[in-house]
Regions:
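Short, surface-exposed recognition loops and adjoining beta-strand edges that mediate ligand/DNA contacts
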Residues: 67-84, 199-215, 226-318, 444-456, ...
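Short coil/turn linking the two alpha-helices of tandem helical-hairpin repeats
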Residues: 158-160, 165, 202, 223-232, ...
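Elongated scaffold/linker segments in the mid-to-C-terminal portions of large proteins
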Residues: 41-48, 53, 57, 61-64, ...
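Conserved, well-structured interaction surfaces
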Residues: 41-64, 85-161, 171-185, 189-205, ...
């Protein structure tokens, strides 16, 4: 959900001027002092070093739900009725984003502000080590975390915006866009350093670990291995509705397998036997000790965080207000695009345990004991991972707290990365072992050699609403064709009011009219340019001086 645009106010402006300028200016009047250690550019001890890096989370916490407003809305799976139709959520849902669209502005700027803060922290802690203020162990923990977070930020940025500026504590430009390969080289460098600096996973996923760095390396190499489009390639398709050709680089896919194997071989991670207990406040960040959560962003709620995690708030904004039992009818901020997403899965895999957690078609209200239905003609299904069911009456209470930690990486992703990379390399039978681990937990049939199509569908089964949708479409080069699947949805046809055999209340008709309009807009508006997001303005609307992406 969108918060007030003040966000961090003066703190953001201070970080912007401090971080961006100092990292991009190598010839200013102070450049001769860059290697001098003074009382002003050191921290006092190990705890202070770690605290300095932890300040970067003020730029990650506001993004936990915001990522969904690009990554999930720019797909066939999710639509948004957050506020007026001119607001940023509905705009992204309809593929009408531009450089001023708030979620693009917010994510892009916060990621770069976090990078600037990482850079300053690394430089300061390096000075502190030289000055004897910080131990080697303290340096490893703090700088390892800073490089981990910087790499994650650059990975998000290049996946969504392509070529982006690269600047570190050693210098660089905040406006000149680097090639895709140069951005990934920086990501790999940071994560390789983090892998060597960080300790092994100890059951607390809020702390980046050696295995979390290896998992991100596996993710990065899979993304890089699927040959992200260059600006020139996007330019060639920007105004059309044809997907580009899929291509890959096998050497990078081999590295994805290598790093996934490192995580697996550590023996420190495993799948939680109960899929439905991966989400919720009382299940967050490995509280059950099952060791599937590998890296999470900690949240304590809106009153404590820079911003709480609104993944629950946005998918379940108004609990049980679907018009039944005399209750009001109010639309959530994000909605499952149509019944078909539930129906198709149920037809394909009726025994998949994950379906009941992913799409709720009915929910019992613990306050009145009644069961509420989320299926046409009443409503569309609810994203179940956004409905906290981990503590007493959490279905009604958690949206007032927004305190659930966000999962960035879990062990299931490592297994599926390995399986997919092996399939892309033509080693399908080897992919069966990691692939079937997910299927065994889900209670569905195992396969001897998964196909690429089965791999793609498994990403849906396992990770719906976990901020992968458009990123996978970018990798597989099927953004346009996947979005155009909405033409098969119940409420896409203009005669939906009469052809489906339903009768609707006024509230229901208004809701499904908006569903219809958003499905139509997705189908009509998606273009090749949407393989990139628009380079946005700054948080105050200023021009950032970065060349715009094709088509915007």
């Amino acid at each position: 959900m969108k918060k007030a645009r003040i966000l961090l106010g003066a703190a953001l402006a201070t970080t912007l001027s401090f971080g961006f300028v100092s990292c991009s200016s190598s010839n200013d009047d102070n450049s001769g002092n860059n290697n001098q250690v003074t009382d002003e550019n050191v921290v006092a001890d190990d705890a202070s070093a770690l605290s300095l890096v932890n300040g970067v989370y003020s730029h990650w916490q506001p993004l936990s739900s915001s990522f969904s407003f690009i990554i999930e809305l720019n797909s066939n799976k999710l639509i948004s009725f957050e506020g007026e139709e001119s607001e940023a959520g509905p705009v992204n849902s309809r593929f009408e984003q531009d450089p001023t669209t708030w979620y693009q502005v917010k994510i892009f700027n916060h990621l770069f502000l976090g990078i600037a803060q990482d850079n300053e922290a690394i430089a300061t802690i390096e000075n502190s080590l030289k000055a004897g203020k910080v131990s080697q162990a303290g340096y490893n923990a703090a700088v390892g975390k800073a490089k981990f977070l910087r790499a994650l930020a650059y990975l998000k940025l290049t996946q969504l915006w392509g070529e982006v500026p690269v600047f570190t504590e050693k210098g660089g430009s905040t406006t000149d866009r680097k090639s895709i390969d140069e951005v990934f080289a920086q990501i790999v460098s940071d994560l390789t350093d983090a892998e060597s600096l960080l300790k092994n996973y100890d059951g607390d996923p809020r702390v980046p670990s050696k295995q979390a760095a290896e998992a991100l390396l596996a993710r990065a190499y899979l993304v890089w291995g699927d040959n992200p489009l260059s600006a020139a390639e996007v330019e060639a398709i920007a105004n059309g509705q044809a997907d580009p050709q899929f291509s890959k680089t096998d050497s990078r896919l081999e590295k994805a397998v290598e790093y996934a194997n490192k995580v697996i071989a550590s023996g420190l991670l495993k799948l939680d036997p109960e899929y439905n207990k991966l989400w919720g406040r009382d299940y967050e960040s490995n509280k059950r000790g099952t060791n599937e959560h590998l890296f999470t962003i900690a949240h304590d709620g809106d009153k404590v965080d820079a911003q709480g995690n609104h993944q629950t708030h946005c998918s379940w904004t108004f609990p049980f207000q679907n018009g039944e039992y005399g209750n009001g009818y109010t639309q959530n901020h994000t909605e499952v695009a149509d019944d078909n997403l539930y129906d198709d899965w149920k037809a394909e895999q009726p025994n998949d345990k994950r379906l009941a957690e992913t799409y709720f078609v009915e929910i019992k209200n613990p306050e009145d004991g009644k069961t509420y239905h989320y299926y046409s003609p009443v409503y569309t299904p609810i994203n179940g991972k956004g409905v906290d069911q981990s503590y007493e009456n959490s279905e009604n209470l958690e949206i007032t707290k927004n305190s659930v930690d966000r999962i960035e990486i879990r062990y299931a992703e490592v297994l599926l990365i390995k399986a997919e990379a092996l399939v892309q390399l033509g080693r399908n039978s080897e992919a069966a072992e990691p692939f079937n681990q997910l299927r065994r937990r889900a209670g569905i049939a195992e396969v001897s050699a998964p196909t690429f199509d089965q791999i793609k569908r498994e990403w849906d089964y396992e990770f719906t609403y976990e901020q992968f949708s458009v990123l996978n479409s970018y990798r597989w080069k099927d953004l346009i064709s996947s979005v155009k699947l909405v033409k098969n949805y119940k409420h896409f046809a203009d005669d939906w009011k009469t052809s489906l055999g339903n009768t609707y209340t006024a509230d229901q008709e208004a809701y499904f009219t908006k569903v219809h309009n958003h499905l139509r807009a997705k189908y009509n508006n998606v273009r090749g340019k949407h393989y990139r997001q628009p380079i946005p303005t700054g948080l105050s609307g200023e021009d950032l001086g970065i060349a715009q992406n094709p088509g915007y």
